[in-house]
From Swiss-Prot:
Gene3D superfamilies: 3.40.50.20, ATP-grasp fold, A domain, ATP-grasp fold, B domain, Phosphoribosylglycinamide synthetase, C-terminal domain. One of its GO terms (molecular function) is metal ion binding. Mg(2+) binds at residues 284, 286. The gene is purD. Its cofactor is Mg(2+); Mn(2+). The lineage of its organism: Bacteria, Bacillati, Bacillota, Bacilli, Bacillales. This is Phosphoribosylamine--glycine ligase. Its EC number is 6.3.4.13. Pathway: Purine metabolism; IMP biosynthesis via de novo pathway; N(1)-(5-phospho-D-ribosyl)glycinamide from 5-phospho-alpha-D-ribose 1-diphosphate: step 2/2. Residues 108-314 form the ATP-grasp domain. Belongs to the GARS family. ATP binds at residues 134-195. Pfam families: GARS_A (PF01071), GARS_C (PF02843), GARS_N (PF02844). It catalyses: 5-phospho-beta-D-ribosylamine + glycine + ATP = N(1)-(5-phospho-beta-D-ribosyl)glycinamide + ADP + phosphate + H(+). NCBIfam families: purD. It comes from Listeria monocytogenes serovar 1/2a (strain ATCC BAA-679 / EGD-e).
Length: 420
């Protein structure tokens, strides 16, 4: 069968590559994809991820068996709705279900209604009221833009000055446009963070291997929040009992609650969780695969990925099996200055020297007229390595990262140290 993946990042590269490794899959197309995907025999289609008519037209012409929509923007713009209305099978939540990611305020109200553990919070549209609440609660405190901000709309403020500045940026300077006209202020939670993704079809939930993302730009979890600077899966210091508690108290009630609300969720539910003294609590929900978590979780999937998605689309029970031993480590190479101001068009060096057993997932790259790869985004690519232990993975992966050393790029050297 022929399949279509919508999106252009490292996540979509990982999804497409895993689909190609499935039985009965002839071709995988990616719209719009990126030039680096071609190296893995993924075929690019020059259609934007929100061009509904273009995607429908292509899916019909190329006899696409099903479409996987990767990023949050097309999900919230109703690309899955449009494909399904045109009679094309599409995996991902419809717009009304993707709202669990699209609005932090909606997610908070939903969690309160269904008693899903999360931090206490309040939502504001008035700057003066929000500032008064800040002063009343004190620091540390967390300030979130209500809408989509590419993973950068969250400030964990340890000082009041930082909290007020974040609030000003969002509400007065409109740093994230309409996304931050409404702001959620929530209590700071202390604990170990981890990502739990699951395949969801209505009330059916099939959890994946857990991962730990590294959101801050710099070593030691310092600097601004990013889309993610690296990840690994599984997370040895999070017990099976904690994962089971998260499934029972968070994922299942969420899936059931969404059905009850008339927001049937079929797709990937991503729970960004924190293990507190009172058990796991929700930091955020996403309505799709995480990036960079996908690049370290999907390589651990033992069952046939395309067959799994196909089963969910036909309301059948999927075969979901993950490796029980070893781990996968992934480190992001980012453009200097990311996540704030960075240049595009810088040449990547050392790519051809990367060991064959290290996976390269391209994100913000493209080829110039000479066929050389240049940067085309903040997060440029991710290298991933499977190994038996974290110290093996780090020992094997970081020399490969060093081959990419170049003043125009940077990466964190401490990804995975917590799991050693």
């Amino acid at each position: 069968m022929n399949l279509l993946v919508v999106g252009s990042g490292g996540r979509e590269h990982a999804i497409s590559k895993k689909l190609l490794a499935s039985n009965n899959v002839e071709k995988v197309f990616c719209a719009p994809g990126n030039d680096g995907m071609r190296l893995d025999d993924i075929q690019l289609v020059a259609i934007s991820e929100t061009d509904k008519a273009g995607l429908i037209d292509f899916a019909k012409k190329a006899e696409i068996a099903f479409v996987i929509v990767g990023p949050e923007v097309p999900l919230l713009e109703g690309v899955v709705d449009a494909l399904e209305e045109a009679g094309i099978k599409a995996f991902g939540p419809k717009a009304n279900a993707a709202l669990i990611e699209g609005s932090k305020d909606f997610a908070k109200q939903f969690m309160e209604k269904y008693a899903i553990p999360t931090a206490a919070s309040r939502t504001f549209t008035d700057y003066a009221e929000a500032k008064a609440y800040l002063n009343e609660r004190g620091v540390p405190i967390v300030i979130k833009a209500d809408g989509l901000a590419a993973g950068k709309g969250v400030t964990v403020a340890l000082e009041m000055e930082e909290a007020v500045l974040a609030l000003k940026d969002m509400m007065l300077e409109e740093k994230f446009g309409d996304a931050s006209l409404k702001v959620v202020i929530e209590d700071f939670l202390a604990g170990e963070e981890f990502s739990l993704m699951a395949f969801v079809n209505g009330e059916e939930v099939y959890p994946m291997s857990i991962a730990q993302d590294h959101k801050r730009a710099y070593e030691g979890d310092k600097g601004p929040n990013t889309g993610g600077m690296g990840a690994y899966s599984p997370v040895p210091h999070i017990s099976e009992a904690v994962i089971e508690e998260a499934v029972q108290k968070i994922l299942l009630p969420t899936a059931k609650g969404m059905v009850k609300e008339g927001r049937y969720f079929r797709g990937i539910l991503y729970a960004g969780l924190i293990l507190t003294a009172d058990g796991p609590k929700v930091i955020e929900f996403n309505a799709r695969f995480g990036d960079p978590e996908t690049q370290v979780v999907l390589p651990r999937l033992e069952s046939d990925f395309a067959a799994l998605i196909d089963a969910l689309l036909h309301n059948e029970k999927p075969d979901v099996r993950f490796k029980k031993t070893g781990l996968t480590l992934g480190v992001v190479l980012a453009s200097a200055g990311y996540p704030e101001h960075y240049e595009k068009g810088n040449k990547l060096t050392g790519l051809n020297d990367i060991a064959e057993d290290v996976a390269i997932y391209h994100a913000g790259t493209k080829q110039d007229e000479n066929g050389d790869f240049i940067s085309d985004g903040g997060r440029v690519l991710l290298l991933a390595k499977e190994a038996e232990t974290m110290s093996d993975a780090r020992t094997l992966l970081y020399p490969e990262m060093q081959k990419l050393d170049n003043p125009n790029f940077f990466y964190r050297i401490d990804i995975g140290t917590k799991a050693e």
